[in-house]
A protein has these predicted regions:
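Low-complexity, Pro/Ser/Thr- and charge-rich linker/hinge segments at domain boundaries
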Residues: 160-184, 265-291
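Early exported N-terminus immediately downstream of N-terminal targeting peptides
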Residues: 273-324
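Bacterial N-terminal signal peptides that target proteins for export
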Residues: 2-13
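C-terminal motif of bacterial Sec signal peptides marking the signal peptidase cleavage site
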Residues: 22-25
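A cross-family detector of function-defining hotspots
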Residues: 310-345, 350-395, 406-409, 413-425
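Intrinsically disordered, low-complexity terminal regions enriched in Ser/Thr/Pro/Gly
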Residues: 27-228, 234-237
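Edge beta-strands of extracellular beta-sandwich domains
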Residues: 150-159, 259-270
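Solvent-exposed, acidic/flexible segments
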Residues: 81, 85, 285-289, 299-303, ...
């Protein structure tokens, strides 16, 4: 079986800087009924891809936060006396989720203006409070950049059935007063968590001890190892509800011994982009034999070995540039769309995305995705079916239905990469 791993620097040290995708992911867009979305996991289809999270701060009210990169918005001004500004329409709808039926219970639309009076900000955060009693809901949030004409819609699961589930916690980095909308944290950051519905409790922190392995190949008889609460070890806790995040997967909860809580994992700086040379060799494991990968990873000069791999695969440095750009662009897309309790490229969907690229079509239901490569009705088309798995660590976990028949397709695509050819649907 061939696997490969390689993480690219934004200004690629060997050849050419790849196009960075300054995006991140909180939950994947979902549909509540069978649908065939035009939306694929190709970042070039998105002008902006915000991250969104919901927080329950009291028994009868909640709040959502939206992060958007300023560089993804269009800032303009009517005349030279005005500040540059971006203008957004943000609307949301809340539906009850009972007995497999939906009922609209709340909807609002607001105008949001961000002014650049004090220079360019890296991110813009919008937040709004709304009334919400205990229960299970879905929430549709739509964002439109009025100056550019681009728009984005996302549906989230909103779970307020108890006080210790994931959306009862807000996560902050270092001394920031702005909450995080993603669960990927830079290694070495000080993490602080608040939970107003559990204000009288000291949070318990846990760390997952086993190594999170790469997913088995799509033709394997094995399934991915999903973290189990029994493999977490309890850390020392105090009233500060904070810790310094070392490498790994963490979990915080107000309910001792419960797997209801807030999970987060550490990443290198710049995530979901790939920037540092010590990251670059990991994703190429999908394309190499174990011996080849060990030769790269354990070498005193892994970059030179990695460069050699790409040049030998491509045949020339110019073709190697194309391979590198395509491969690491896909790594960044996987990190953007498929992050769960680990980096997106390490998930089932990330693995398929790196090797096969964006599918021709995606059929979605509330709890599944089917990726179709080729014409849907053709006998020659390839279908990958992913089932959503309920997990205390993430709301974005999809597991591939593996099949021995995928082996020839996988080996053909890996062989194409190793012979300097990239297929894009």
């Amino acid at each position: 079986m061939h696997f490969i791993q390689y993480n690219l620097v934004a200004r690629l040290t060997l050849f050419i800087g790849i196009v960075s995708v300054f995006l991140s992911n909180c939950t994947a867009p979902q549909k509540t009924a069978q649908s065939s979305d035009a939306m694929s996991y190709d970042s070039e289809e998105f002008v902006f891809y915000p991250t969104i999270c919901v927080y329950h701060y009291s028994d009868d009210s909640s709040q959502f936060y939206i992060d958007i990169f300023s560089s993804d918005l269009l800032y303009a001004r009517a005349n030279s006396n005005e500040d540059f500004s971006a203008e957004l329409d943000i609307s949301y709808k809340v539906f009850t989720q009972e007995n497999n039926t939906e009922k609209l219970i709340d909807s609002t639309k607001v105008r949001f203006i961000d002014r650049q009076s004090n220079g360019q900000k890296s991110k813009v955060q919008f937040t709004s409070k709304f009334k919400l009693l205990e229960g299970l809901y879905s929430m549709s949030i739509s964002i439109k950049d009025l100056r550019r004409g681009s728009s984005f819609t996302q549906t989230l699961k909103v779970d307020k059935r108890n006080k210790s589930s994931r959306q009862n916690y807000l996560l902050f980095r270092n001394s920031s007063t702005v909450p995080e909308t993603v669960n990927s944290i830079k290694k070495g950051d000080t993490i602080r968590i608040i939970s107003e519905r559990n204000s009288n409790s000291v949070l318990r922190f846990y760390k997952y001890l086993p190594e999170i392995k790469l997913p088995p190949a799509p033709f394997s008889s094995n399934s991915p190892d999903i973290p189990s609460f029994k493999d977490f070890v309890k850390l020392k806790s105090d009233s500060s509800n904070s810790l310094i995040a070392e490498e790994g997967l963490y979990f915080a909860t107000a309910a001792e011994g419960s797997d209801d809580g807030c999970a987060f994992f550490t990443v290198s700086g710049g995530y979901p982009t790939v920037r540092k040379i010590d990251q670059l060799h990991y994703p190429v494991r999908y394309l190499t034999t174990k011996a080849e990968f060990d030769d790269i990873a354990k070498n005193k000069f892994p970059k030179e070995k990695l460069d050699q791999f790409w040049i030998e695969s491509a045949g020339t440095k110019d073709r190697a540039r194309v391979l590198i750009s395509s491969f690491y662009h896909r790594v960044e897309e996987a990190n953007t769309f498929f992050s769960s309790y680990t980096e997106g490229w390490r998930t089932d969907r990330g693995m398929i995305h790196l090797v096969f690229g964006s599918p021709t079509k995606i059929n979605r239901t509330k709890n599944s995705e089917t990726w179709i490569y080729g014409e849907e009705e053709s006998n020659a088309s390839l279908h990958f079916h992913f089932q959503k798995i309920e997990s205390p660590w993430t709301d974005n976990l999809f597991v591939l239905n593996r099949d021995p028949l995928f082996k020839s397709h996988w080996e053909n695509r890996v062989s194409s990469w190793r012979n300097g050819r990239v297929y894009n649907n």
